[in-house]
Amino acid sequence: MAYFEKGFHISKDDTKILNLLKPRSGLVRAVLDTDTYNEIDDQFALVQMMLSHERIKVEGIYAAPFSMNERADNPEKGMELSYDEILRLLDRINVSHENFVFKGVKEYVGSAKEVIEAPAVDELIKKAHEGSADNPLYVIAIGAISN
């Protein structure tokens, strides 16, 4: 049996990939990619994640762009507003943002899917490479998939 989604194919013989999809027990490594200022649900998600020490080792938070409403008229402004909101939330729960919160891309990836440089992108790549099949990095992306 195979699973298809937009050209991506996984067969039951792809045990490495399928094993990565299985729920893990214990502490998992994760980063959060979020357009926190866009809507309030991301703020709740960020705080819940930070308070879930017994299950999630949060290794970073990345500000994602947004521009779909009156809060931001372009992706860069949306990302900056989200970055500032992340800092405010962490301050309220007494968590340092140093080497933990990173600014994301200033524009959307778009249909060309070209690489856009940003501190969040570099940090995400670094953290992913630190992982392994036994200890993967989970990327919780609740904003635009641009970082």
What are these regions (language model features)?
Residues 1-147:
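N-terminal acidic, glycine/proline-rich low-complexity segments
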